Amino acid sequence: MEETGIKSIVIKEICDIARKYNVQKVTLFGSRARGDFKARSDIDLAVQGGDFIRFMLDVNEETSTLLKFDIVNLDEEIQNELRESIKKEGKIIYEEI
């Protein structure tokens, strides 16, 4: 996932937190998924299933990055354009099998 500018340890931490809170799927989207990010671009995540609030809090507090996160709950209503964008350009970084 280095092409996203996100260190592999941070991806692992996100996956561990997803597992901890029974999240079904985490998708990276936005500039980091497209590859047109800047050094300080935030990390956009779309989340399905599990305890969204606790996942979001832990990702913001317990990952070893100073980058900001923008986390969207796909189990709630979001703009159709955003949902389509996530579907089109998103990269799945965690999926419960």
PLM regions and their residue ranges:
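Catalytic core of pol beta-like nucleotidyltransferases
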Residues: 1-25, 33-39, 48-97
